[in-house]
């Protein structure tokens, strides 16, 4: 969860 807030780009990788 913290990674998503710090790195929005990570959100694309998780999806």
Swiss-Prot record:
It comes from Pisum sativum (Garden pea). One of its GO terms (cellular component) is chloroplast thylakoid. On the 2D-gel the determined pI of this protein is: 5.7, its MW is: 24.7 kDa. This is Unknown protein from spot 114 of 2D-PAGE of thylakoid. Keywords: Chloroplast, Plastid, Thylakoid. The lineage of its organism: Eukaryota, Viridiplantae, Streptophyta, Embryophyta, Tracheophyta. It is found in: Plastid, Chloroplast thylakoid.
